[in-house]
Amino acid sequence: MPHHYILTLFGLLPVATNISTWWNFGSMLLTCLALQVLTGFFLAVHYTANINLAFSSIIHITRDVPYGWMMQNLHAIGASMFFICIYIHIARGLYYGSYLNKETWMSGITLLITLMATAFFGYVLPWGQMSFWAATVITNLLTAVPYLGTSLTTWLWGGFAINDPTLTRFFALHFILPFEIISLSSLHIILLHEEGSSNPLGTNPDIDKIPFHPYHSHKDLLLLTLMILLLFITMSFFPDIFNDPDNFSKANPLVTPQHIKPEWYFLFAYGILRSIPNKLGGALALVTSIMILFTIPFTHTAHLRPMTFRPLSQLMFWTLVSTFITITWAATKPVEPPFIIISQATSLLYFTFFLSFPILGWTENKMMNTP
């Protein structure tokens, strides 16, 4: 039995015996966070937050710094891995009703928003062509805010256009936000262990629990090993798979790329933004696409917690997953038919899931004849 209180805490942590592989993503996210902070620190040591030197400093890191290429690729691909894990983690929470642990769910969605902000600021730092124009387009959405929009945008930019002050403050924010993420993650884990994890059956697992270590810790190690293996294979053989070709050119404010788009993990929100032909409407839809996740614990009306035994909810859940993938794909395409109508239809379907959520619960209660 370990004597150190932290080891004892994890060793004796009671966990349901029947949690599946879908519960492994929390530990994978923790590993991704540690990797990002570590590689980010080594990159920050060599990076220069200046519009004339930022792009050159990235080239310097990749070419001249020992193992700089590894740090740079691990940081970029690690961000994609982070988002893959967090989207699966949220999907598992939706499917198995983990959102009924309200405080944990709320802290988790706050974590997602902080992570998205951190990733956005990081995407601007290389000062490539796509970095510059994606930052211009996204920050310009603030001008849609009535009365305060222009003042807010000028304040964020530090001037009347994206320039050196913008890059400096984005670097400062990109450096400080991971510490916010670490704090929120600690809070998330503390809140989770107040009530304990849910399980695939949605039953009260108190009568059948086992210690986290060695049982679940060894189970977690399998997927962790596979994730790190996948990360290193991608880094070694396909290092530029997630990169935009335009970002290999230095930012030029005088030349607009043919098709401006952010990183793939923001494309679903960007696709929803683009599907509405109005600036304020699009900006509101973009914000709502994330914020609507906060409403889920309050719209759960089913008597059963998970979707394991709820066929209608399962159908809508997998429709949501396919919708998410389709919006992401459509957002990579130019704004022209048929991609406009595909984006609009999938955006409507995306919001339909959340709006129909309470109705589905009531319908399923009636189907099961539960009082």
Curated annotation (Swiss-Prot):
Its cofactor is heme b. Heme b b562 binds at H75, H174. Gene3D superfamilies: Cytochrome Bc1 Complex, Chain C. GO terms for cellular component: mitochondrial inner membrane; respiratory chain complex III. CDD domains: cytochrome_b_C, Cytochrome_b_N. It is a multi-pass membrane protein. Its main location: mitochondrion. It is found in: Mitochondrion inner membrane. A ubiquinone binds at H193. GO terms for molecular function: metal ion binding; ubiquinol-cytochrome-c reductase activity. Heme b b566 binds at H89, H188. Signal peptide: none annotated. GO terms for biological process: mitochondrial electron transport, ubiquinol to cytochrome c. Binds 2 heme b groups non-covalently. InterPro entries: Cyt_b/b6_C (IPR005798), Cyt_b/b6_C_sf (IPR036150), Cyt_b/b6_N (IPR005797), Cytb/b6-like_sf (IPR027387), Cytochrome_b (IPR030689), Cytochrome_b_C_euk/bac (IPR048260), Cytochrome_b_N_euk/bac (IPR048259), Di-haem_cyt_TM (IPR016174). Heme 1 (or BL or b562) is low-potential and absorbs at about 562 nm, and heme 2 (or BH or b566) is high-potential and absorbs at about 566 nm. Belongs to the cytochrome b family. This is Cytochrome b. It comes from Apodora papuana.
